[in-house]
Amino acid sequence: IGGGFNAIEHKEAIKSFIETHTNTAIIFATARYAREYLDVNAPHFYCLVGNEGHRLTHNINPQNLSGICVLPPYPRPMGTEVPEYAKNVTFELENITFIDQYKDSVTTIALQLAILLTDQDIYLVGYDGYPGNVLSEKEMALTNENRTIFATYTTISGKILKSLTPSIYKEIEVVSV
């Protein structure tokens, strides 16, 4: 689950999809909408890179944390903030196997974890992209980063990532939730 608004806009349909597809895990590339999915009966994983630990603290109370936090492999150039209450459920990925760039990206961490968890289809939610012709420098950099990550995943795995919510990324296939 990425940080795009479609993760909220379509959350009931997404929850229904998860309930009907047993053996599904939820991997939060960002904790932005983690609170919205606490009631879903599926394993929860939270990618912690940079300030995502702070965002997790803001969105999930210690008593509501029922998942696993995942860190990128060491060294971590962006650093990582792990909330005190999550330290005993935090694990570090051994390595990133599908891409040589963007190893500290939350999207890379989420995809690597998904690769470790399944050999089936991987579904994305909330990777809306940034519409419009005028993007900020940060939006353009993130767009290019995600496009590279998605394309590399497809090249390495031979599979196309599927999005359950609308997305402007041409590197992924949008399927109806």
Question: Can you describe what each PLM-predicted range is?
Answer:
Residues 1-177:
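Metal-ion/cofactor- or nucleotide/acyl-coenzyme-handling active-site neighborhoods
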